[in-house]
Amino acid sequence: MRIVFAGTPEFAVPTLRALIASGHPPCAVYTQPDRPAGRGRKIAPSPVKQLAIEHGLPVFQPASLKGPEERERLVALEPDLMVVVAYGLILPTPVLTVPRFGCVNIHASLLPRWRGAAPIQRAILAGDRETGVTLMRIEPRLDAGPMLGKRSCSIGDDDTTASLHDRLAGLGAEMLIELLPGLAADRLTGEIQDESQVTYAEKIEKSEARLDWQKDATSLSRRVRAFNPWPVAETTLEGTVLRIWSAQVLDPAPDAPPGSIIACTKNLDVACGRGALRILEVQPPGKRRMSAKDFLNAHALAGKRLGT
């Protein structure tokens, strides 16, 4: 079976690697154009491109798939199937009709819950106890195609977007390889999504990272976990931004105004609208990440408040 793979970030790498390892190396790999990355903002290839080059796979990097020349190039590849994982570009209808068995996408949620750009973060923010991956046929509407398979996993109290991202990326790769024979035989029956159960995972905005200490400790803990590794939860201490990488809920808490530092000797505990948050790892401006204990050793915080 001739497979075209389309993906860009780290989330897509396990699936491409699994296709290669299973004896189904793609006849072509599509990925987004090289872009500035890292602290130096140097132009760098995507993680998918790096893996494709390592294995000698042809790589295409169009800025868009909307032009007729891109459809013609895809037609020339004579694909049986196009596998899409976090590609980042819209596949127009003329492209969707090219592969013999269509185009499929691995989405990082149990559809129809959390269609959209940020399903992992939104699942954590909502307090979901379970998430997973869905293999679906791609249709013009966003994440709305028939579902060909699902795999689920639990969301632990300590899970961050980073940890869940890696688990789901591996789960998606395993699912695709398991379902590949059915795709090749064109015998997978798609399950129509229940539109009454749809929720949308809006793109994460950097402004969401600022913690509001009036909120309860549980919701603030979810924000810390959801925004690790980006954009990273933050607060202010005497007008200076303090990033918070890790925290845990304490309950009950002393009666103190939200944002008040209620312990600052062995632990850094902060009063919330309900309950309290124990901050475990922070990052001051221009500094590395450090444990709250190391931060406390260098700062006198008794009687101070966060968010000021």
Swiss-Prot record:
Please write the reaction equations for the catalytic activity of this protein. Answer: L-methionyl-tRNA(fMet) + (6R)-10-formyltetrahydrofolate = N-formyl-L-methionyl-tRNA(fMet) + (6S)-5,6,7,8-tetrahydrofolate + H(+)
Where on this chain does (6S)-5,6,7,8-tetrahydrofolate bind?
S109, L110, L111, P112
For this UniProt record, give its keywords in alphabetical order, as a comma-separated list. Protein biosynthesis, Transferase
Q: Which Pfam families match?
A: Formyl_trans_C, Formyl_trans_N
Q: Name one GO cellular component term.
A: cytosol
- Entries under SUPFAM superfamilies matching the protein: FMT C-terminal domain-like, Formyltransferase
Q: What is its EC number?
A: 2.1.2.9
Q: Which domain of life is it from?
A: Bacteria
One GO molecular-function entry: methionyl-tRNA formyltransferase activity
> Keyword Secreted: yes or no?
no
As for family, the record states: Belongs to the Fmt family.
Query: What does this protein do, in the record's words?
Result: Attaches a formyl group to the free amino group of methionyl-tRNA(fMet). The formyl group appears to play a dual role in the initiator identity of N-formylmethionyl-tRNA by promoting its recognition by IF2 and preventing the misappropriation of this tRNA by the elongation apparatus.
Query: NCBIfam families, alphabetically?
Result: fmt (TIGR00460)
Output the HAMAP family linked to this UniProt entry: Formyl_trans
State what protein this is by name: Methionyl-tRNA formyltransferase
Taxonomic source organism: Methylococcus capsulatus (strain ATCC 33009 / NCIMB 11132 / Bath)
Record gene name: fmt
